[in-house]
From Swiss-Prot:
UniProt GO molecular function: N-acyltransferase activity
Enzyme class at the top of the EC tree: transferase
UniProt-annotated catalytic positions: 242 (proton acceptor)
The protein, known as: UDP-3-O-acylglucosamine N-acyltransferase
Amino acid sequence: MMSTLSYTLGQLAAHVGAELRGDADLPIQGLATLQEAGPAQLSFLANPQYRKYLPESRAGAVLLTAADADGFSGTALVVANPYLAYASLSHLFDRKPKAAAGIHPTAIVAADAEVDPSASVGAYAVIESGARIGAGVSIGAHCVIGARSVIGEGGWLAPRVTLYHDVTIGARVSIQSGAVIGGEGFGFANEKGVWQKIAQIGGVTIGDDVEIGANTTIDRGALSDTLIGNGVKLDNQIMIAHNVQIGDHTAMAACVGISGSAKIGRHCMLAGGVGLVGHIEICDNVFVTGMTMVTRSITEPGSYSSGTAMQPAAEWKKSAARIRQLDDMARRLQQLEKRLAAVTSSGDASSDA
């Protein structure tokens, strides 16, 4: 049976620096949406489309901006950014188990590996020769940490994460189950139709405060390291090929695929299913919408898309048929433009006479 986490509203207000409008002693035992929250839960209004649920919400208190709070008769925590405040408070109610320091008896740790005494190594984990595990790191069951790999302080690896050899991970990095970091890049040379493997002798370097989702793969570099900057957030099932570079605080949604040696700038956002060809660059502050195929470098900040938007199937079939006729339509248009130009030129000559 789970124990109940409980804070007073005053404690929560102090945690996020909120203006409290209501009873500071009100007990709060969780977070919930405006529609689902009860009297012992805190909710928030961050998206205007949910404002319609505010008057009827049963939440014990609501995180609101000053503008929304002025028209609200209930208990509120007034903040500049309700969503950011919610993000901060969510950690107070997080029930993720905290592993105790120490090495499980079934774990296999090389004699020359370094594991900080405050780190936790789970059941059947393997830590190979020369690896270094920093202070407060939590390594889940069945993880493999390859030779000479380094995990910075405060890192958290869910069960069954695999780090190959010579992977360097910064501080406070979270990696979800099934992720594989440092696998061999897809590199081959062709000799008369036969593929000859190229040894991938680079590594992977990951900065601080990075999050890597379940079943995401980051390949090691062919020569130099694949580089992931500070604060990068990677969703589940992302594929990052060898020698890719990702700038600080860039975020990617699920199923993004990035080909080798592509370089992505800082503060970019790639929505789900985006694909990048290799050896191109994306500048800072670029947003790429879902399922876009990026085939050339992007040199100006902004939002980019490719493909066609969803439409009813019957209309899409008509559009697809018209696409097949574009070449013929373009030729006919050129012919009409030439005839129009000839008629216009003839008319001008007649008026001059």
